Regions:
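Conserved acetyl-CoA-binding loop of GNAT-fold acetyltransferases
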Residues: 144-153
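Residues forming the Rossmann-fold NAD(P)(H) cofactor-binding site
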Residues: 110
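Conserved GNAT acetyl-CoA-binding A-motif
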Residues: 122-131
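Acetyl-CoA-dependent GNAT
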Residues: 4-104, 113-115, 119, 154-156, ...
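Conserved G/P- and acidic residue-centered "switch" motifs that form tight phosphate/ATP-binding loops
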Residues: 107
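Conserved beta-strand-loop-alpha-helix junction that forms the acyl-donor binding cleft
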Residues: 130-140, 156-161
Length: 177
C-alpha cells in the first residue's frame, strides 16, 4: 500500500525528508484536532511538531504515512498513518487520519478510508483497529459512519482517555461490539 488512487484522491507515501509546511497547514486548520491533542483550543502546531510527527510516522518498516492529495491538482489536503501490523498485535491500526478543515464534509475522508481498507484487504488483513480521543466526539462519529464499532476504552501514552474501535474487512462478517 504505497500508492492508492480513488476518483478524487491520490494517497502516496510521505517523503520523510520533504518540507512539512503543507502538513503544518493541515494540522493547524483543525481546531477540534488541536483541542483534542493539545488540550487547549488556541495552541497551534509548529514545524518541529510536524517534523517529529513525520519522523515517528515513518520510522518503522511497518509504519506508513500517506499524504492525501487531490487527484486533479495534487494539492496536499491530509495525511493518514497506517501501522500494519501494530507492535505485538495481529492486525493493523490506523494511527491518524486528518484532513484540512476546508475539505471536510465532502466525502473525501470516507473515500480515503475506503481506499485504505481496500489496500489492507489486498495485503491479506481481515480487520483494522483505531483509537479515538474521547475529547473528539466528531472523530468518533465519523468512524462509526464508516462502519467501525467501539469495543473498549483505554488511556494513550499521554494519559488521555480514548475509545478503541475496530472494523472487519471481511464481507458479511458481523462487527464485534
Amino acid at each position: 500500500m504505497l500508492h492508492l488512487e480513488t476518483p478524487h484522491l491520490v494517497l502516496e507515501l510521505v517523503d520523510p525528508h520533504s518540507p512539512p509546511y503543507d502538513l503544518l497547514t493541515v494540522f493547524n486548520s483543525n481546531p477540534d484536532f488541536l483541542e483534542a491533542t493539545r488540550g487547549e483550543a488556541l495552541s497551534a502546531f509548529d514545524l518541529p511538531d510536524v517534523k517529529t510527527f513525520i519522523q515517528t510516522a515513518t520510522s518503522h518498516a511497518y509504519n506508513r504515512c500517506l499524504a492525501i492529495r487531490l487527484r486533479e491538482t495534487g494539492a496536499l489536503i491530509g495525511a493518514v498513518v497506517v501501522v500494519a501490523p501494530h507492535t505485538g498485535q495481529p492486525y493493523p491500526w490506523l494511527g491518524l487520519l486528518i484532513l484540512d478543515s476546508a475539505w471536510q464534509g465532502r466525502g473525501l475522508g470516507a473515500e480515503a478510508v475506503q481506499a485504505i481498507e481496500e489496500g489492507l484487504t489486498q495485503e491479506g488483513w481481515t480487520e483494522v483497529h483505531l483509537c479515538v480521543l474521547e475529547a473528539s466526539s466528531r472523530a468518533r462519529a465519523f468512524w462509526e459512519r464508516q462502519g467501525y464499532t467501539v469495543y473498549g476504552e483505554r488511556r494513550d501514552r499521554e494519559g488521555r482517555a480514548c475509545w478503541l474501535l475496530r472494523k472487519s474487512l471481511v464481507m458479511g462478517e458481523p462487527q464485534h461490539g
